Amino acid sequence: MSQRHSDSSLDEKLLEYRFHAELRLDANGNPIPGLPMVRSSLKARANAAFEPDASEPLPPPPSPEDEEPPRPIVLSTQSPAALKMGTQQLIPKSLAVASKAKTKSPARHQSFGAAVLSKEAARRNPQLFSAPSFSLDDMDMDMVTTGNLRRNLRNQSYRAAMKGPGPPSSKGDSVQLGPKLQALAEEAAQPPSRYPAKNKKTLGRKRAHKGSFKDDPQLYQEIRERGLNTSHESDDDILDEPSGPVGTQRADTTIVVKSYRPAQLTWSQLPEVLESGVLDTLSTEERKRQEAIFEILTSEFSYLHSLSILVTEFLQSRELRATMTQTEHHHLFSNILDVMSASQKFFEALEQRHKAQVCVEDISDILEDHAQHHFHPYIAYCSNEVYQQRTLQKLSNSNAAFRDVLKEIEKRPACGGLPMISFLILPMQRVTRLPLLTDTLCLKTQGHPERYKAASQALKAISKLVKQCNEGAHKMERTEQIYTLNMQLDFGKVKSLPLISASRWLLKRGELFLLEESSIFRKIASRPTCYLFLFNDVLVVTKKKSEESYLVQDYAQLDHVQVRKLEPSEPLLPGGSSRSSSVPYPFQVNLLHNSEGRQEQILLSSDSASDRARWITALTYKERQWQGITNKGELPQVEVTKAYFAKQADEITLQQADIVLVLQEEDGWLHGERLRDGETGWFPESFAHSITSRVAVEGNVRRMERLRVETDV
């Protein structure tokens, strides 16, 4: 114990020696002659107080055994230093740090004395060991912080720095302190903060694009446009500079996927905007309009960057091309080069307007022109989606060489650890997000009639394009599906039904258990089954013969079909017993006018509550079309957290950040209406989070109604 105490005392003495040399003090504690404008002596003590000058010679370094007696404590307000007058003050160099952008670069110089002092402060106060390491040189003296941790560390470091003088060391280690503090110049090599403070100008960057949004290109899959949010109709706008770290949002706004990163720069953070001084005179609404314009530009750049990765890493890969046929390669990548060319032209037009004006007058004319005359490759690409998804699934399931090569490509740093499918669906994502971004621009121009009219026309043009993309995708899928089923259905002795029709499409298909009186008490595995094909206008009941052949038993127009869920207490058949555990989820289908003009009743059972709910919902398609939804504002809403691809006809494909009105919930599945286009379908509950903010819910409904009216979707 004594040895430890002795070592501690020796460390303190050595520390005093080094610090004495740092301040260039003589034996009496006075500054060395030659320092200008120093009026009186200064001798720091271990307790941060001061005593009058002494003339005794400098003592030799004390040994651990030779301890000085404790000195009296003098209050700082009564010390001679506090009573002395002067125009200059000597402070440790380690505290003379001007405001600068903080950096984690290890290249910053830290004096030996400052490093020892910080360690000494931590040794004297064990509580500091739990705090994160820090450098005195990296402390921003002008930064305002409300955290107790950083403020306490600053106070601790100052007390440690003013600990007191000791015997000086060699001259080579001394540091000359001038009477005037010089501000440190900002380092050009420091990377800019992603979200600098509003009043802090981060100018003078020597980067590839001089602080441009091109400095740090992000994959489109990783960003979330702020204009997609629907709770920004008030002055509390999400286009304001983010106040939190990347990936976080304010409370009580729409839920945002944590993996998303907002765009790295906002318009008001651009160096040219800061240098122009326009922010001092610009109104809040105009600044928000500029942010909306700039976000369309930056998000298009990220989208174009991701498309270039798809082309260079996947499309142009010789190894990947060698694993498939030319037809499969075409179905997989379609006309992606044409889509990329259209995006390149669109971005160049936006960038040219951005470079010409610090405050962009308008981009509505660019949006409308490209939507009408240059974005037609999107329609062809979206129409090919059904072949693309089928080809990718086939290659992934049956082609080992394709799987191996694809896995190696996806591991490359350029792909960001993302699968190829996330790149293939980018055109569909971008074209469906453009109306929402343009709608945000409309909201920001409501105070300017001419700009609002131009933005509304651009919104109509883009919405018309999206509608054509959706119709193209549905038409190709439905046409191929109808022709395939027409060859697979065998009507046999049943009156033939002309199946092929341009206005007919499949709503749902699947196998169900058929309940008979003789089979009520049988096990599920031994019960007979039937296979249903439900179209938007007719129900076809078949018996499955093979994977590609079905024998038609009966059919009826959907207007003549009724469905009813059977409760546990109800008998399955007239005069029969109540529901058995072997028949878990039964329901009844009545054909009021079948293929022979007679009434027929069918008792069916599914293997899950969600499957039964989905069949009942599909069979009541006609009724729901007529009834509609009266008050959508009362419906719960969810935001999709990860993309979901429909696997059955009654399911809906969703993208990240899609808003969905929940119409029904059953056994882990949700049936909802997609906000952006009104399409309905089922999807797993685990792919979305509930929106709990009432303000966000009401904003979503208002935006949906406005989009439906202005775009006639």
UniProtKB/Swiss-Prot annotation:
Task: Spell out which residues are annotated as carrying Phosphoserine.
Answer: 6, 41, 111, 212, 231, 234
Where does this chain carry the motif PDZ-binding motif? 711-713
Biased composition annotated in UniProt, kind: Basic residues: 197-211
Q: Which GO terms label this protein's molecular function in UniProt?
A: guanyl-nucleotide exchange factor activity; PDZ domain binding; receptor tyrosine kinase binding; small GTPase binding
Cross-referenced InterPro entries: ARHGEF16/ARHGEF26_SH3, DBL_dom_sf, DH_dom, Ephexin-like, PH-like_dom_sf, PH_domain, PH_ephexin, SH3-like_dom_sf
Look up the record and give one Gene Ontology term from the biological process aspect. Answer: cell chemotaxis
Segment Disordered: which positions?
44-77, 185-249
One GO CC annotation: cytoplasm
Phosphothreonine found at: 230
> What SUPFAM superfamilies does UniProt report for this protein, alphabetically?
DBL homology domain (DH-domain) (SSF48065), PH domain-like (SSF50729), SH3-domain (SSF50044)
How does this polypeptide assemble, per the annotation?
A: Interacts with ELMO2, EPHA2, RAC1 and RHOG; mediates activation of RAC1 by EPHA2. Interacts with TAX1BP3 (via PDZ domain).
Q: What is this protein called?
A: Rho guanine nucleotide exchange factor 16
Gene name per UniProt:
Arhgef16
